[in-house]
A protein has these predicted regions:
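Active-site pocket-lining/capping segments in soluble small-molecule metabolic enzymes
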Residues: 1-39, 43-182
Length: 182
């Protein structure tokens, strides 16, 4: 039984209105300040994922009118494209996604969305398990955004976030959690 819907665009609110579901704000809302949290609370959202572009101090300082979560692990979306680069290059896998490789050899996973609107992911996952600051930001939840991981990798990541003595793996990013947006 479905109990909640995640909306990543304010245009989704009328679609889920009246369905009797809890409405949760997803990463696509790009919630960047306390006024946005207040507005989303007034619009009836139950919780919100804050922007991945916020520094940890900014997340901490938000007035949390509604419960907040942040992505603390995972490949963050870089862009959603109207035209599918996989289909255009003859690599379409019927919705199973693929990979774009840049001139440096970095591999960017492509997740296929509804209506063949692919989401291009960062080549490196965000990793904060070994950094205590995210635990002091007043978040209700921490989200592990598992997209391309195998079951074994997902279990390892979960154990890293539940434990206290796990060094960072190779090939990760801290995202904008420490440097923010310029």
């Amino acid at each position: 039984m479905m109990t909640a819907a995640a909306v990543s665009n304010l245009g989704h609110l009328p679609i889920v209105d009246g369905l009797g579901l809890e409405v949760r704000g997803d990463l696509g809302l790009n919630v960047f300040n306390s006024r946005a949290l207040l507005l989303l609370q007034e619009l009836g959202l139950e919780s919100v994922t804050v922007s991945a572009e916020l520094r940890h101090q900014q997340v901490r300082d938000l007035r949390k009118y509604i419960p907040c979560e942040a992505v603390v692990y995972g490949r963050l979306p870089l862009m959603v494209t109207e035209n599918c680069p996989l289909r255009c290059s003859g690599q379409c896998s019927a919705g199973n996604g693929g990979v774009l490789t840049d001139r440096t050899g970095a591999r960017f996973p492509v997740l296929c969305g509804h209506g063949c609107r692919p989401e291009i992911q960062n080549s490196r996952p965000l990793y904060l398990a070994d950094k205590p600051e995210w635990k002091k930001c007043g978040l209700r939840w921490a989200r592990l955004r598992l997209t391309t991981e195998t079951a074994e990798e997902a279990l390892d990541i979960l154990q890293r976030y539940q434990g206290s003595d796990f060094p960072a793996p190779a090939g990760f990013t801290r995202g904008l959690f420490y440097r923010g947006v310029e």
